[in-house]
Amino acid sequence: MKILVTGGAGFIGSNLALELERQGHEVAVVDNLLSGNKNNLKGFNGKFILADVAENFEVSDNFDAIFHQAAITDPRYPNDKETYEKNVNGFKNMIDLAKKNNSKLIYASTAGLYGNGKVPMQEDQEKDILSAYGRSKLEMDRTAEKLFNKMHIVGLRYFNVFGPREKYKQRAASMVYHLAKQIKSGKNPRIFKFGEQKRDHIYVKDAADATIKAMNVKKSCIVNVGTGIATNFNELI
């Protein structure tokens, strides 16, 4: 299949692009390199397009599937308005491209929509939005739901993803990454008070596998992507 990965120089996007290529697909990556890094794509043989999908993005190729990972993901990004508008506009542009080419569209949402909500977290539970990033993803999900009967569109609410190619996320990298970095440097790991806060941590290769499987779902949907296992920070270290 011919596949486009947006945000493909980022953390999940690069792992996804490399795995899709390993499986024999013809893959193109688009990234504006705002937070992604081409070093994440070492070994990638497909086309790289330097562009911002939130702007007037055009591509001449026809793709069978689009994996939309591009977004401002750092909840501490200083401009909430820009975070919301770029994320929502980029998604709408990918919807337009998918409609034009009759492509399957699989996009990154977030389990951050549940905030401090009840566990186990279910897709239909009340949302607890804590950031502009969360608001943008909720708007994307609402837009997707209106298209369920019109196109193949799948939203993936990732929980706490960790693994290779994460370091360029810097402060927005996972707690697993930061704890491992501190331990490797000989420092005592810094955790939240008492370290009893629980999170669902999923390895990036498992998240990529789940993302690829979304190409073959029978019905458009929005689903959680995690392990279903809550681990506290004390257990991590």
Which ranges hold each PLM region?
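N-terminal Rossmann-like NAD(P)+-binding domain of SDR-like oxidoreductases, especially those catalyzing
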Residues: M1-F159
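Residue-level preference for the first positions of well-ordered beta-strands
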Residues: K2, N188, S220-I222
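Structured beta->alpha junctions
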Residues: A9, L33, G195-E196, I229
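Short, hydrophobic secondary-structure boundary micro-motifs
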Residues: Y107, R190-K193, V223-N224
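NAD(P)-dependent short-chain dehydrogenase/reductase
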Residues: A132, R142-R199, V204-M215, A230
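Mid/C-terminal beta-alpha module of Rossmann-like enzyme folds, strongest
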Residues: N216-I237
